[in-house]
């Protein structure tokens, strides 16, 4: 037997108001409020996705429309505090390209790509050698990027990770999709006063 659940016409008249409220609620999730909004399940989904992709570390970037940039709001690397202070402008670099096109991106020799903006690499003092970036949607819009990287290894450190492949990108895309559902559920639950979210 198929599961079938049709929209309830009684709620249709409230759809526009709910959509508007959802957009306003989504804009409240910023670098300053992310740690209060996010729960362990959300951050675990990201960490598991980065690990499954074979990344050295990963970052969730959320758009800051007022400043026209992407702000790092979550990172699971060794320099998490420094990373969460960083931003990337929306007018250059591959992460901004993914945000504007809505298309995922994967490259293993990224340091050779002239479109790669090395600003973050310089700020953390560790060159990126490979990157996956996928758009992150919630509240019906692309509002950020989920990215993960391989970093250049220092002499004498552990061997380089395997190259990113299509399975790596699927893992990061899956994590972003799960995170979308968690964000949307939490926002809608808070708006309608449902549950303990």
Question: Model segments located where?
Answer:
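Sensory-domain boundary capping and coupling elements
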Residues: 95, 136-156
């Amino acid at each position: 037997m198929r599961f079938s659940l049709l929209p309830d016409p009684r709620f249709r008249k409230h759809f526009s108001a709910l959509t508007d409220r959802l957009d306003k609620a989504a804009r409240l999730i910023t670098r300053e409020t992310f740690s209060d909004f996010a729960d362990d399940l959300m951050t675990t989904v990201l960490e598991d996705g980065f690990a499954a992709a074979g990344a050295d570390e990963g970052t969730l970037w959320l758009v800051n429309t007022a400043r026209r940039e992407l702000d790092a709001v979550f990172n699971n690397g060794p320099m998490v505090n420094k990373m969460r202070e960083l931003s990337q402008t929306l007018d250059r670099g591959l992460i901004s390209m993914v945000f504007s096109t809505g298309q995922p991106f994967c490259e293993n020799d990224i340091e050779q790509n002239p479109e790669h903006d090395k600003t973050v690499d310089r700020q953390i003092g560790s060159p990126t050698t490979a990157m996956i970036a996928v758009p992150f949607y919630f509240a019906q819009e692309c509002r950020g990027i989920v990215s993960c990287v391989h970093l250049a290894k220092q002499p004498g450190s552990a061997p380089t990770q395997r190259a990113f492949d299509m399975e790596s990108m699927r893992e990061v895309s899956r994590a972003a999709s799960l995170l979308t559902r968690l964000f949307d559920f939490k926002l809608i639950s808070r708006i309608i006063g449902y549950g303990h979210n």
